Design a protein with these regions (language model features):
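Substrate-recognition/cap helix-loop segment adjacent to the acidic, metal-dependent catalytic center
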Residues: 25, 47-50, 81, 85-95, ...
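Conserved SAM-binding loop
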Residues: 5, 76, 94-97, 131, ...
């Protein structure tokens, strides 16, 4: 979600990166922002367990608190709702997924009114499926919920290489978008089916590929 359909940049820094950095630093663990950026798209608890050592439980509690304190400041990526409406008009089922904790993911979706306004059909996260990307577990869970059997009918859109790998592992079509913090060259190395500037270009790509 963050970087693909959710704009989590607050005061020039993505909320997830700032929350990572500050929660680690509070416990005397210095992690370069560049290292944290490489972890985008991964399950947040797993990242903190990997980098935080014995301090990980306390760091994770602070991390979640920082996210929750700032959730009302996040907004959707420009044009996301319009794209969702276009997809709905063309009978496309929509699921969003995240590496955020379940309660945080739920609260972001609620804050943006996506479910209540009928803009998406389903949400899930790595904590719910108990597997992190690049496992295709979140995609497969969404497919089951939305009664989709053929993964070739799924288009996975993501702003991270690990998200694109997740799409490959599910045998779905994959689209990288440049609205996150990972560079085009890095995303292209993951071999997505297309690289778009943002989700706003998705309808045009689907029409060009005769998929809508």
């Amino acid at each position: 979600m963050a970087g693909t359909t959710v704009d989590d940049v607050i005061d020039g820094v993505p909320l997830v990166l700032r929350s990572y950095y500050d929660s680690f630093k509070r416990h005397g663990v210095e992690i370069p922002m560049s290292t944290l950026n490489e972890m985008r798209g991964r399950d947040k608890r797993e990242v903190i367990n990997m980098l935080g050592g014995e301090k990980a439980p306390a760091i994770y509690r602070d991390f979640v608190s920082m996210l929750e304190e700032n959730l009302t400041k996040v907004k959707e990526i420009s044009g996301a709702s319009e794209v969702f409406r276009w997809l709905k008009k063309h009978d496309v089922r929509i699921a969003v997924e995240s590496g955020f904790p379940a309660l945080v993911t739920r609260d972001i979706v609620k804050h943006l009114h996506w479910l209540e306004n009928g803009l998406i059909d389903y949400w899930t996260c790595s904590e719910i499926v108990e597997e992190e990307r690049p496992s295709p577990a979140m995609i497969r869970r969404a497919m089951r919920h939305l009664h989709i059997r053929d993964p070739s009918e799924v288009v996975k859109v993501d702003d991270t290489t690990i998200g694109i790998e997740e799409g490959h592992n599910s045998k779905s079509l994959t689209i990288a978008v440049l609205t996150g913090t990972q560079r085009r060259e890095k995303l292209e190395a993951a071999k997505p089916d297309a690289v778009l500037n943002s989700i706003r270009e998705l309808p045009g790509w689907l029409e060009e590929m005769h998929l809508a």
